[in-house]
């Protein structure tokens, strides 16, 4: 699913006129978690939500050429609008291409620093040792999955998940487990997963913002969105390997990646097979080199901390 390109023709709108004094006061009454430097609070349905069709637009970030997205825009509460120094639109292929050139695996799509390891609860920014594209979505049963006052059935819930997460960027797979009250959403690019993780955190699956506001006032719990752990299923690992190989194959000239026709000579087939073999060897070499470099960096970091 490609995002609406009409946002390029308009300025980004202000999502929130001003910061609520009630929210600021409420934040100051909570305890501080000294390990993560954040306020501790109970989860509830957010009264703010990103509307990609209405909120997307041009900002100062587009003029400056930044690759970083606005975190507050993703959460539906940026008060700067077109004056914001960060991007206000859904991540597109061009953003991913720019990230590969100008970005760094040490930062997420919002410019926040990643860590060597994921948190134990798989929340937070994530790890720079792994480009995770799969999100774990929990607490679905309590996230206001209702229609006309009645609970949705399993098929309707999965359809709602596909719609709500699909409008934030192209997805590869969605797996809903009603007996576990959770789902797994896998995106095509990791920057899209990073964006969607923040955009759908503490949201509901309702289509009405008015219903979200009512649920927020009732302290109802929203969606629990965090990083999915690596799937031990061999089929899942095969899919991951295939994705990496396809990404490297896309870097080859078109004539070396086209499927040979029946009239293609044996020489052409041999050249294509050799190119594919080189790409697979390159993938294994890059993986080993990257792993070794990251391990070396972790050792240096531990020495610095000592």
Swiss-Prot record:
Residues 251-277 are annotated as: Disordered. One of its GO terms (biological process) is positive regulation of RNA splicing. Pfam families: Torus (PF16131). Its main location: nucleus. InterPro entries: Cwc2/Slt11, Nucleotide-bd_a/b_plait_sf, RBD_domain_sf, RRM_dom, Torus, Znf_CCCH, Znf_CCCH_sf. GO terms for cellular component: post-mRNA release spliceosomal complex; Prp19 complex; U2-type catalytic step 1 spliceosome; U2-type catalytic step 2 spliceosome. The keyword Zinc applies. Residues 133-230 form the RRM domain. It is found in: Nucleus. GO terms for molecular function: pre-mRNA binding; U6 snRNA binding; zinc ion binding. It comes from the Eukaryota. Disulfide bonds: none annotated. PROSITE patterns: RRM, ZF_C3H1. Keywords: Cell cycle, Metal-binding, mRNA processing, mRNA splicing, Nucleus, RNA-binding, Spliceosome, Zinc, Zinc-finger. A zinc finger (C3H1-type) spans 64-91. Residues 251-268 have a biased composition (Low complexity). The C-terminal RRM domain and the zinc finger motif are necessary for RNA-binding. Belongs to the RRM CWC2 family. Involved in the first step of pre-mRNA splicing. Required for cell growth and cell cycle control. Plays a role in the levels of the U1, U4, U5 and U6 snRNAs and the maintenance of the U4/U6 snRNA complex. May provide the link between the 'nineteen complex' NTC spliceosome protein complex and the spliceosome through the U6 snRNA. Associates predominantly with U6 snRNAs in assembled active spliceosomes. Binds directly to the internal stem-loop (ISL) domain of the U6 snRNA and to the pre-mRNA intron near the 5' splice site during the activation and catalytic phases of the spliceosome cycle. Associated with the spliceosome. This is Pre-mRNA-splicing factor CWC2. It comes from Candida glabrata (strain ATCC 2001 / BCRC 20586 / JCM 3761 / NBRC 0622 / NRRL Y-65 / CBS 138). The gene is CWC2.
